[in-house]
C-alpha cells in the first residue's frame, strides 16, 4: 500500500510503513477495543512496602502510551503512561519468544499499547509489570516532540500534545473541573437549581459588549451568540423559579489578551427576595468554600509581574468605588468637576465610552485604570455610578448610584453583582437611553429587548444577581497570569492551529 504523505500533518514515513505492513498481514494497528483489568492508577495503588522481586499479582491487563524504550539484550524496559501516571514494563526473551524482537520493530514512543503480565519489583525496587503479551492499540504517526522546546503558541494550538507531555497543563485542567464541580455542589446545598438558557438569541444583552452574529437560514434572521446569561435567567425568576444558576459559555467579539478570551465560561445566579448585600455574603462564603476545598487552605500564592503575593480569602475588604478612587487620587472625587475628570482622563490616555464624557462613565474608566491594579487582596467595590449599567436597581439611599458591587482579586475583576432592576417603567427608559448612546457612537450600548421588558411587566420579585468569571478564578487557583493556560482550547488564529 502506498501513501502520499501530507507534509502539513508531519507523518513519519517509517511509522506509516509499519501501519501498512501490519494491515497487509491482517493485523489491525487500531483495534476496536481492549479489555483491561486495572488502570495504571489502580496498579500504583497495589504498591507494597516489602517490594518483592517475585511476582505477587498475576494476569494484570492494562494500557498506556509509550514514553520511552530501553533495549538491553534479552531483558528490556519500557515506560508507559496514562492519566498522568507511569508504569515500567519488563520484556524478556524467554517470555515473549519471537515477539520480543518484533516489539522493537513495530513499537515507538507515542504508541498506545495494551499489555498483560505479572506485577513485581525489580532489584532496584521499582514496581514493574513483566509482560507476557502485548497488543498495539494505536500507532502514533508523529514523533512526540521535546516538550521543553515547545513554544506557548504550539502548546495552545495543539493542546492534546500539551496535555500528554506537560503535567502542569494536565493539573490545570484537573483544578478547573474540580472547581466547577465544587461550585455546583455549593449552590445545590444552598437550594439553587441549575438551568439552561439559549446560546443563540434574537437580541443579545446582559452586558456591554460586542456580539458575534450568525444567520438562521430557516427564519432568514440574524441571531447572536449570547454575551451574558442574565436576561433569560431573570425570565426564570419571573416564571417562579426563585433560586437559579447556570455555568456556561458566553461570547464577546472583543480583545484577546492575558485576561480576555472571546469565548469564556461564566457563572450567573439569581436569587429572588434577596439584594446585593445577600449576594455579597453568598459570594464570600462560596469563594471561601471553593478555595479551601481546592487548595486545602484559605491562602493562595499568586504571581503578578514577577512578584509573588499571598492572597487571603478568609477576609474580604469592602469599599465604595468613589472612596477607592479618592484614596488613590488623594482628592475627593465627589468634589471634582466634570472638567477635572475629563482632564484626568486625557492625562491617563483614556478614551470615553462612545466618545461621550459622561461623569459616571469617566469615574468608572478612571477606577479601572488607577484603582484596579492596586486591589490585590479580595475587595468588594460597591455602589457604582448609575450610568454604568441599565440593569441595576437605583441605590436606596445614595442618589446617582446603583446597588452594584464588583469583586476584585489580584488586580482583576472576578465578580459582578446587582440588586436587580425589576421596575419595567425604569427599565424601558434606560434601554431607550442606551439606544440613544448607540446612535451617538457607543457600539457597546445595550440593545432594547422588548420581550425582557414585557417579562418584567408581569412582575419580577426583588432579586439579587451575581456573575463570576470562572476562567479568572481558575487563573488564581493555579497561579497562572495568562487565561490561555487554563482554558482547554483558547482562541487562536486558524492559521496557527492548522499549521504546525
UniProtKB/Swiss-Prot annotation:
Catalytic activity line of the entry: tRNA(Lys) + L-lysine + ATP = L-lysyl-tRNA(Lys) + AMP + diphosphate
Record keyword Phosphoprotein present: no
GO molecular function, one term: magnesium ion binding
Main localization, broad class: cytoplasm
A cellular-component GO term for this protein: cytosol
Keyword Cytoplasm attached: yes
Protein family per UniProt: Belongs to the class-II aminoacyl-tRNA synthetase family.
Subunit structure: Homodimer.
Protein name as it appears in the record: Lysine--tRNA ligase
Taxonomic classification: Archaea, Thermoproteota, Thermoprotei, Sulfolobales, Sulfolobaceae
UniProt gene name: lysS
Amino acid at each position: 500500500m502506498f501513501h502520499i504523505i501530507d507534509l502539513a500533518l508531519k507523518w513519519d514515513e517509517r511509522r506509516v510503513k509499519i501501519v501498512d505492513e501490519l494491515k497487509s498481514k491482517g493485523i489491525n494497528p487500531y483495534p476496536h477495543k481492549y479489555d483491561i483489568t486495572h488502570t495504571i492508577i489502580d496498579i500504583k495503588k497495589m504498591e507494597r512496602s516489602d517490594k518483592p522481586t517475585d511476582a505477587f499479582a498475576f494476569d494484570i491487563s492494562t494500557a498506556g502510551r509509550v514514553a520511552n524504550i530501553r533495549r538491553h539484550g534479552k531483558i528490556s524496559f519500557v515506560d508507559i503512561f496514562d492519566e498522568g501516571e507511569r508504569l515500567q514494563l519488563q520484556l524478556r526473551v524467554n517470555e515473549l519468544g519471537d515477539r520480543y524482537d518484533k516489539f522493537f520493530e513495530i513499537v515507538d514512543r507515542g504508541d498506545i499499547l495494551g499489555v498483560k503480565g505479572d506485577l513485581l519489583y525489580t532489584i532496584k525496587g521499582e514496581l514493574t509489570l513483566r509482560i507476557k503479551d502485548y497488543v498495539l492499540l494505536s500507532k502514533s504517526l508523529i514523533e512526540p516532540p521535546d516538550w521543553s522546546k515547545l513554544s506557548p503558541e504550539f502548546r495552545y494550538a495543539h493542546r492534546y500534545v500539551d496535555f500528554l507531555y506537560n503535567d502542569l497543563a494536565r493539573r490545570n485542567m484537573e483544578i478547573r473541573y474540580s472547581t466547577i464541580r465544587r461550585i455546583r455542589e455549593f449552590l445545590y446545598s444552598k437550594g439553587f437549581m441549575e438551568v439552561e438558557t439559549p446560546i443563540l438569541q434574537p437580541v443579545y444583552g446582559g452586558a456591554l459588549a460586542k456580539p458575534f452574529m450568525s444567520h438562521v437560514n430557516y427564519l432568514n434572521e440574524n441571531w447572536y451568540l449570547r454575551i451574558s446569561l442574565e436576561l433569560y435567567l431573570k425570565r426564570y425568576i419571573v416564571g417562579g423559579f426563585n433560586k437559579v444558576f447556570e455555568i456556561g459559555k458566553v461570547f464577546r467579539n472583543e480583545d484577546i489578551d492575558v485576561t480576555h478570551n472571546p469565548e469564556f465560561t461564566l457563572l450567573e445566579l439569581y436569587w429572588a427576595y434577596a439584594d446585593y448585600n445577600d449576594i455579597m455574603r453568598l459570594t464570600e462564603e462560596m469563594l471561601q468554600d471553593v478555595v479551601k476545598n481546592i487548595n486545602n487552605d484559605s491562602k493562595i500564592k499568586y504571581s503578578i509581574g514577577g512578584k509573588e503575593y499571598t492572597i487571603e480569602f478568609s477576609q474580604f475588604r469592602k469599599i465604595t468605588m468613589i472612596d477607592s478612587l479618592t484614596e488613590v487620587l488623594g482628592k475627593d472625587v465627589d468634589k471634582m468637576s466634570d472638567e477635572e475628570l475629563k482632564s484626568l482622563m486625557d492625562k491617563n490616555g483614556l478614551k470615553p465610552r462612545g466618545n461621550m464624557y459622561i461623569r459616571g462613565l469617566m469615574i468608572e474608566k478612571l477606577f479601572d485604570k488607577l484603582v484596579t491594579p492596586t486591589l490585590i487582596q479580595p475587595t468588594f467595590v460597591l455602589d457604582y455610578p448609575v450610568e454604568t449599567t441599565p440593569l441595576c436597581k437605583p441605590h436606596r439611599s445614595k442618589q446617582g448610584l446603583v446597588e452594584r458591587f464588583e469583586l476584585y482579586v489580584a488586580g482583576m475583576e472576578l465578580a459582578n453583582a446587582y440588586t436587580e432592576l425589576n421596575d419595567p417603567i425604569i427599565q424601558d427608559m434606560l434601554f431607550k437611553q442606551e439606544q440613544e448612546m448607540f446612535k451617538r457612537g457607543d457600539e457597546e450600548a445595550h440593545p432594547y429587548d422588548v420581550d425582557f421588558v414585557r417579562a418584567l411587566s408581569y412582575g419580577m420579585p426583588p432579586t439579587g444577581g451575581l456573575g463570576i468569571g470562572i476562567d479568572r478564578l481558575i487563573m488564581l487557583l493555579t497561579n497562572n497570569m495568562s487565561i490561555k493556560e487554563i482554558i482547554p482550547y483558547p482562541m487562536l488564529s486558524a492559521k496557527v492551529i492548522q499549521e504546525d
